[in-house]
Regions:
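Non-heme Fe(II) oxygenase catalytic core, chiefly the N-lobe of the double-stranded beta-helix
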Residues: 2-242, 248-295
Length: 295
C-alpha cells in the first residue's frame, strides 16, 4: 500500500488522503493530520477505497467533531441514503444543482456531508467545490466594508433567482412549504472561527434592507467573486471514491445528470447524524423530485 500522505489538490480547496486503510484502525497522528487538513482545505478525497456504512459514519462524525472519537456513541451506524439516477429512492435523480450549502435555509447548516461511489459509470457528472473562507480572505477591502453588518435571506424551494443561462437544466425540489433563515453575510465558522462569505447562488434570495435591484447586483458581484474558475475544483467520480466536506465553508454544485445517462449512485451520510434525523423528523417536510428516466 502507498505510504500515508495528504496532498493539497489546489491552493484554495481540497486535500487528497492516500495510503490509509479506512476499514482498519486509524492512528491518532493520522486523525490529527486529517482533521488539520479538513479544517484548512475543507474537502477530503479518498480514491479507490473500501468503505462500509459504519466506517463512513465513523469518518464523518469524527471529522465533524474535530477528532473526538467518543461522538460515535449512540449513533445508528446503519442509516444512509443515496444520490442516484438509478436507485428508486435516490435523491436529486437528474438535472443540475447550483452551488449551495445543504440546508442553508435551516438552523442546522453546520454539517459534514460525505458521498461514496457505490456504482459510477464513465462520464458521470462531476461535483464541484469552492472554499468560501478563501473567498472572504481575498474579497476586495471595499466589498468587505460594504457587506460587513449586512445579512442575507436563504430559502428552500426553487433553485436560484432565475438568472442563469440554463434554467431548464435545474432540478427543482417540491416542498410542502417554504423554509427560510437570515444570517450575516460575513459569518464565523462554528468550529474553526474562520470568516466565510456566507451566500450561495442556489438558496440566497436577497440581502436584507437593500432595494431589490441593489440586492441582486451585489449578490451577482459576490457570486462572480466566489465562483471564479481558478478557485474551484471538480471531482470526477469513480466507483470506490469517498469525498467528505465541510458543509458551511465549502459550497458544492453538480453538472447536469441525465436520468437515463451514465449510472451515478453515491451513498450519502451526513454528520451529526442523530441530530439531523431528529431535526428532519420534527420538520416533517422532505422534498420530492419527479422520477428520473429508467437506466
Amino acid at each position: 500500500m502507498t505510504q500515508f500522505h495528504i496532498r493539497k489538490i489546489s491552493p484554495t480547496v481540497g486535500s487528497e488522503v492516500q495510503g490509509l486503510d479506512l476499514m482498519g484502525d486509524i492512528r491518532a497522528d493520522a486523525w490529527r493530520q486529517m482533521c488539520q487538513a479538513f479544517d484548512q482545505t475543507g474537502v477530503l478525497v479518498f480514491r479507490d477505497v473500501d468503505v462500509d456504512v459504519p466506517t463512513q459514519h465513523r469518518l464523518v462524525e469524527t471529522l465533524h467533531h474535530g477528532g473526538d472519537l467518543s461522538k460515535l456513541d449512540g449513533i445508528n451506524t446503519d442509516g444512509f441514503g443515496y444520490i442516484s439516477n438509478k436507485e428508486e429512492e435516490g435523491g436529486a435523480p437528474y438535472g443540475r444543482l447550483l452551488y449551495h450549502i445543504d440546508m442553508h435555509w435551516s438552523e442546522m447548516p453546520f454539517q459534514t456531508p460525505s458521498l461514496y461511489g457505490v456504482e459510477v459509470d464513465p462520464g458521470a457528472a462531476p461535483t464541484t467545490f469552492v472554499n468560501t473562507v478563501h473567498s472572504w480572505k481575498v474579497l476586495p477591502d471595499e466589498l468587505k466594508a460594504r457587506v460587513k453588518g449586512l445579512s442575507a435571506r436563504h430559502e428552500s424551494g426553487q433553485q436560484g433567482r432565475g438568472r442563469t443561462t440554463y434554467e431548464a437544466e435545474l432540478i427543482q425540489p417540491d416542498w410542502a412549504r417554504s423554509h427560510e433563515t437570515i444570517t450575516p453575510i460575513a459569518m464565523k465558522h462554528p468550529r474553526t472561527g474562520g470568516t466565510m462569505l456566507y451566500v450561495c447562488e442556489q438558496q440566497t434570495r436577497e440581502i436584507i434592507g437593500l432595494p431589490k435591484r441593489e440586492s441582486d447586483a451585489l449578490l451577482d458581484t459576490l457570486f462572480a467573486h466566489i465562483y471564479k474558475p481558478e478557485c474551484i475544483i471538480e471531482h470526477h467520480w469513480r466507483t470506490r471514491d469517498l469525498v467528505i466536506w465541510d458543509n458551511m465553508s465549502i459550497q458544492h454544485s453538480r453538472h447536469y445528470v441525465e436520468g437515463g445517462g451514465p449510472v451515478r449512485t453515491l451513498r450519502k451520510i451526513h454528520a451529526p447524524y442523530n441530530e439531523l434525523r431528529h431535526y428532519m423528523k420534527n420538520l416533517n417536510d422532505i422534498p420530492t423530485y419527479a422520477e428520473a428516466e429508467p437506466v
